[in-house]
Amino acid sequence: NAQVDAPGNDIVVGKGSAYDLYLSRHIQHASLVRAASSQAVVDTFLSGNHQVAAGVRQQLEADAARVPGLRLLPGRFMVIEQAMGLPRNRSARAEALLRSFVEHAKASGEVAAALQRNHVQGVSVAPPARG
């Protein structure tokens, strides 16, 4: 977002987070300020003269509910795709079984149900795997 990546803007991020790495590589004009953790981003943002707090939407939504006067920008600046894997020495059959398990869990609604059961908001189930 050009409004965020502007000279004079400080963007507070959780130190060592995936979005810290992403923004470190992509921000050209704004400065990054690293909070001790992702949970500390908004408190660090509020305690200083910072312009932007960046983080995981669920955490920022919880902070916005806790602190009046905060607003979330629409959209997102990155997506973290989750994955499962196996050691290289596992058989092709093991790989196929894992792939089948994951695809079945997504298609059957098990993943969506687990997200709902655990009150996880602001996320979506990945589409079917390609190829």
Predicted regions: what is each one?
Residues 2, 20-21, 42-43, 61-62, ...:
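Alpha-helical elements of the RecA-like P-loop NTPase motor core of helicases
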Residues 2-18, 31-32:
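Short loop->beta-strand "edge-of-pocket" segments that line small-molecule binding or catalytic clefts
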Residues 4, 23, 45-46, 50, ...:
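Residue-level signal for nonpolar/aromatic packing positions in well-ordered secondary structure
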Residues 12, 33, 51-56, 71-73, ...:
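Paired acidic/hydrophobic, glycine-rich loop segments that form the ligand-binding mouth/hinge
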Residues 15-17, 37-38, 54-61, 98, ...:
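Beta->alpha turn/N-cap motifs
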